């Protein structure tokens, strides 16, 4: 008999089947189940939700497991029981076994799901579906605002009694105004989630104070309205492990590994999520490892993604204050993708705001390593790295994306790229190495490139406006800086190139001006750049039918020798051999230019006159001109001048 000891009211069982079949439990009984799934139980006749892990149905009533702290998956006899257990809020489950999902696992507020080294969840083998859901819902009822609410405001108003908002309530605001974060809204309208910190009513109007300022103007003319969503709050996933490596098992499809919608304070750390895509294959069924839609205050840390059909982390809707740290994504479409909310029909709402990616790595992505899809505001990547992407390393398709100390290696296109109409991404101290087309591509709408490096590409920087300041560029086969427009309709804006190292290393020109795309060199200024070694051939021009006016230039270097010295005037004149250079022809695809010679008088005799440079001459020796035999003349307005004069040669 399975009942091995009976000393009333103590009942001890060696197996679960015998315990749940026992017919004579009493409320006062002390009940113990032995074994790895064992524990102490109490008997009750009060109706309880059966999950076959913490609550069992037995003859005449229910057995309730006595425990403090988390429940363990090893307690449960099937997946359905775990789903039942987690269907209520305030749950804590430790997954310490391999679980075969047969449905979606929904996680409610104030819950924690953590995995041991042996715990994992295998996706449903019968139906491709989501694995873990943290899902709230949009408001079912909206009310109009009572007055306009301007961007920056932390107060909205509604008619008194129209909205049952109290302190701690979440609100969902929206209007018909289109999002403005990027150049292509795709019809997505503005929306935001805010939390109520105070409510007051006066004169038929309720004023609601919000926890954060609004990012947009919510005007009555745009049908601005507000409702109360159902939010899932305060969920933590520790070391979630979804799927196993097994490329021959094509039944382990899932659409989304972890899906969150209308959630707040969701934190995922140290996970592993494995897709079902064969290594290197193009996209297949299965969208994202983690998806945040209309979520606020979310984090992902230290999580790895492998062979995902689409995205490692996807952020869309009005998700706000999302941080992703220390992820590793291998063979996915994008490691991180900021996206627009898409529906088959009907309205679309919200763009990601305040996104931060830190120390994230993407390997062998099938498209860009990191992408921002057309909308989004205040997006920043710090110390992120893309290796061997099949497209760009980083792609900015929304305005003003900022990259700090990021790196792109061996991208099939650009190391860092923007897209049509995207205005002024910001790159600071970033490195692009051996990318096929360019290190940094800002030719769709301008950009700012500060103290960056690009090595081993066709072009170091492609740009049509903005600023390239500081940094170092080597081994770029065509040019270090290519002034062009990748789309003819894009307007060229002023471009400053300042303090950049573009020394000649046997390949390419320093700067390439693309007349074919209508580039006007007079909108470019160049100062303090080191173009040592390029000599006469520092610039490349193409597509001009008449000779263009050169850019504004000051204190640029073409050589590192023969560019400084001291001359003593004799009878008001001195001829100086120096590496002065110039192009004096009128060929269309060339600039007419001459070196700038700065003169500084060192002595001041009574015969001193005004100084000027005349007669710049270039050596014409055949077959190889000698630049050290180039010369210029310093001439004083006083033929008796015997001053000593320091000279410096610049472009």
Residue ranges and their predicted role:
Residues 5-66, 92-142, 239:
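Extracellular beta-helix/beta-solenoid repeat scaffolds
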Residues 164-182, 215-241, 583-603, 642-651:
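Extended Gly/Ser/Thr-rich low-complexity repeat segments
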Residues 113-116, 165, 232, 236-239, ...:
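All-beta strand scaffolds that present successive hydrophobic residues in beta-strands
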Residues 175-202, 231-356, 361-364, 369, ...:
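Right-handed parallel beta-helix
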Residues 7-25, 121-216, 573-575:
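Autoprocessing Asn-cyclization modules and mimics
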Residues 559-651:
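Extracellular attachment/recognition segments
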Residues 83-86, 100-114, 121-154, 158-163, ...:
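Extracellular beta-strand-rich solenoid/capping regions of secreted or surface-exposed proteins
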Residues 102-104, 122-127, 246-256, 277-289, ...:
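Short glycine/acidic-rich loop motifs that flank beta-strands on beta-rich extracellular proteins
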């Amino acid at each position: 008999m399975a009942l091995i000891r009976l000393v009333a009211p103590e009942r001890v069982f060696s197996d679960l089947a015998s315990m749940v079949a026992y017919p004579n439990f009493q409320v006062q009984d002390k009940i113990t189940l032995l074994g790895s799934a064992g524990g102490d139980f109490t008997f009750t006749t009060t109706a309880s939700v059966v999950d076959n892990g913490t609550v069992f149905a037995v003859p005449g009533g229910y057995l309730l497991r006595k425990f403090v702290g988390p429940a363990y998956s090893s307690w449960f006899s099937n997946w359905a029981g775990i789903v039942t257990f987690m269907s209520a809020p305030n749950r804590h489950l430790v997954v310490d076994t391999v679980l075969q999902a047969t449905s979606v696992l929904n996680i409610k507020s104030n819950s924690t799901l953590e995995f041991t080294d042996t715990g994992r969840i295998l996706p449903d083998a019968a139906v491709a579906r989501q694995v873990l859901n943290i899902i709230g819902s949009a408001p079912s009822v909206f009310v109009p605002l009572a007055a306009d609410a301007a961007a920056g405001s932390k107060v909205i108003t509604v008619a008194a009694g129209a909205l049952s908002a109290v302190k701690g309530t979440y609100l969902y605001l929206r209007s018909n105004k289109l999002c403005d974060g990027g150049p292509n809204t795709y019809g997505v309208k503005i929306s935001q989630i805010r939390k109520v910190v105070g409510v007051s009513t006066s004169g038929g109007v309720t004023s609601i104070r919000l926890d954060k300022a609004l990012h947009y103007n919510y005007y009555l003319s745009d049908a601005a309205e507000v409702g109360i969503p159902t939010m899932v709050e305060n969920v933590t996933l520790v070391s979630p492990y979804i799927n196993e490596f097994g490329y021959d098992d094509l039944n382990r499809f899932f659409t989304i590994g972890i899906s969150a919608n209308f959630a707040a304070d969701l934190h995922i750390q140290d996970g592993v999520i494995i897709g079902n895509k064969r290594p290197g294959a193009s996209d297949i069924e299965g969208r994202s490892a983690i998806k945040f839609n209309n979520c606020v205050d979310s984090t992902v840390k230290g999580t790895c993604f492998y062979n995902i059909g689409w995205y490692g982390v996807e952020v869309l809707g009005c998700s706000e204050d999302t941080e992703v740290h220390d992820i590793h994504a291998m063979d996915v479409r994008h490691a991180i993708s900021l996206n627009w909310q898409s529906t088959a029909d009907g309205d679309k709402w919200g763009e990601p705001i305040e996104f931060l990616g830190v120390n994230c790595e993407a390997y062998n992505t099938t498209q860009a390593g990191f992408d921002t899809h057309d909308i989004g505001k205040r997006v920043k990547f710090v110390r992120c790295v893309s290796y061997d992407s099949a497209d760009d390393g980083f792609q900015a398709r929304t305005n003003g994306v900022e990259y700090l100390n990021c790196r792109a290696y061996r991208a099939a296109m650009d190391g860092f790229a923007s897209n049509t109409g995207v205005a002024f991404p910001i790159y600071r101290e970033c490195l692009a190495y051996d990318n096929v087309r360019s290190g940094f591509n800002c030719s769709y709408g301008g950009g700012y490139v500060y103290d960056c490096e690009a090595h081993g590409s066709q072009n170091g920087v492609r740009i049509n406006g903005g600023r390239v300041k500081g940094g170092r560029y080597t081994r770029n086969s065509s040019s270090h800086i290519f002034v062009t427009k990748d789309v003819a309709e894009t307007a060229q804006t002023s471009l400053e190139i300042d303090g950049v190292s573009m020394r000649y290393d046997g390949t390419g020109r320093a700067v390439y001006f693309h007349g074919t795309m209508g580039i006007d060199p007079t909108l470019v200024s160049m100062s303090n750049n080191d173009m040592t070694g390029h000599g006469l051939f520092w610039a490349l021009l193409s597509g001009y039918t008449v000779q263009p006016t050169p850019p504004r230039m000051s204190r640029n270097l073409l050589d590192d020798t023969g560019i400084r010295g001291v001359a003593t005037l004799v009878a008001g004149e001195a001829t100086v051999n120096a590496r002065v250079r110039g192009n004096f022809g009128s060929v269309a695809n060339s600039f007419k230019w001459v070196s700038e010679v700065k003169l500084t008088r060192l002595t001041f005799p009574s015969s001193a006159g005004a100084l000027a440079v005349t007669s710049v001459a270039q050596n014409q020796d055949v077959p190889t001109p000698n630049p050290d035999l180039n010369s210029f003349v310093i001439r004083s307005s006083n033929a008796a001048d015997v001053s000593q004069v320091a000279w410096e040669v610049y472009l």
